[in-house]
């Protein structure tokens, strides 16, 4: 059978299900595919099929994630569901599956539980733009309890800086919908309408300001210095002014040539592997680990706060805890930089398998903005992963 061409007639959005263990995330994922399949907008995926999620490696960390796709009348969705709690934490912190929004699943029978809180906090820390809530198992919950659960949820969302009063909360039963109950199926359609309307359409990488991490540098005699790398976002054109940022002093220059696969282009865009030729840049002024960016859009920093996950021994991480002033390498985009870790007040040590907020001071500045992902390494071996949550200086 020939592969169907990917139609780009609808906006594409990445979402995922989050929430406490056994509250019905995977059942809901299966129910969405089953209800949308009836409308001809998805392929039905069985619960067991989603639950046996394949393992993937992202920044040296193994994560189990199930990928499902479906569409509504308005959009095309890629949906991720993780079987285990640790997989969620790793997924959100490494950005393995960058989410444009998430469906928070809460069982009406239990209300918010510890992992509910933890997932909301993580969603805030790693900047998931919007959440929609599915209050599940309402068929077996006490109606008076449901009202309390909804109030409690709105307070919890507000506590973590989400607009708790405005977030849509849809009540339903994922299991009943999966069994084909008409009322329950209606709630799933209502949920998808809320996701369509409430989760904002993401800005495409190509529409963001230009940025390319430098992977390699070489000189072409008589022509100048070339930096190569994969363009992360935006578009660059010949004769445009750019800045070289990070590690060394920031330098303005002009792109005098763009090459891709030995072809000369007049522009490069997000996703392209390109070589950029710079005017008046010496080979000693640019190196791997710097970025080329639209002037004024990114700045170099050494001190930041981050949310990190530290690998367990079984995951190939450290075998022992680390303490304040731990000095590993932080791998940003294309290079390792040594940094010192400051643990939060009252935390004496960090055990393999922990996730927490830390403060880091790097020995050289790196071009960064909030939300930048990194790996934590010791001698080239990954021992953790993180996301920049706040820049200090």
Curated annotation (Swiss-Prot):
Substrates-to-products reaction catalysed: GTP + H2O = GDP + phosphate + H(+)
Keyword vocabulary terms for this entry: Cytoplasm, Elongation factor, GTP-binding, Hydrolase, Magnesium, Metal-binding, Nucleotide-binding, Protein biosynthesis
Enzyme class: hydrolase
Cellular compartment(s): Cytoplasm
PROSITE patterns in the record: G_TR_1 (PS00301), G_TR_2 (PS51722)
Chain spans, region G4: 136-139
Main subcellular location: cytoplasm
MF (Gene Ontology): GTP binding; GTPase activity; translation elongation factor activity
Annotated binding of GTP, by residue: 19-26, 81-85, 136-139
UniProt-annotated stretches for the region G5: 173-175
Its EC number(s): 3.6.5.3
Entry keyword Nucleotide-binding: yes
GO cellular component: cytosol
SUPFAM superfamilies, per database record: EF-Tu/eEF-1alpha/eIF2-gamma C-terminal domain, P-loop containing nucleoside triphosphate hydrolases, Translation proteins
Gene3D superfamilies, sorted: P-loop containing nucleotide triphosphate hydrolases (3.40.50.300), Translation factors (2.40.30.10)
Protein name from the UniProt record: Elongation factor Tu
Organism from which the protein derives: Chlorobium phaeobacteroides (strain BS1)
